Amino acid sequence: MENTFRSCRRAFRCKNQYEAFVTLNYVLQSVTDISSWLKKIGTIQEAVFNHEIDFEKTSPDSLLYSGQLILKVIYASIHLQEFPAIEKKSLGWSHLADSWIQKRCKNESETLLPLQILQYGPKNLSQEEILDPSAFIKAFYQKQSLKKWIKRWNRFREMAFYRDSTFDGDEGAYLEDFTCFKKLLEASYLILVRYSPI
């Protein structure tokens, strides 16, 4: 199982920006859409905080596999720190959702509904972070190194299977880090939608 920092580093790292886009395209578009990935992070977060997983609804394999693919996004995102911001007046639906989601929305309604934007648009990023997702990613890696974020995510994946609490008063820090991971996922997705050469 690719569960340690060293083994994941070998298997999941991206050598350059193009490889990062290949990884993001696979994880965030081929496997499932962004809203599903946010739910998967939420499932791991719930397991960490509640210490009781309903394995009839959530299999151990799904937690492990989802966690590994999110690791790939974390590794890829290190290459996404230098993209330009978009001006507020030029921001459109094509800057927020990939063509597959846009097509799904069009099938649901000829006009873009506010509910569709709420369902498929970014939920965790601030307005400034939506306009400049690279700035968020840069701040993410200024807060902690890639190695520390990887270790943190692997720790969360492990804790999802614990039956007893290991918080020791760190709940606030854990919640903040889960929010950061959700934001990183959304920021990486926005850069993929706007700038992918694939």
Residue map of PLM features:
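Sequence/structural signature of long amphipathic alpha-helices
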Residues: 1-198
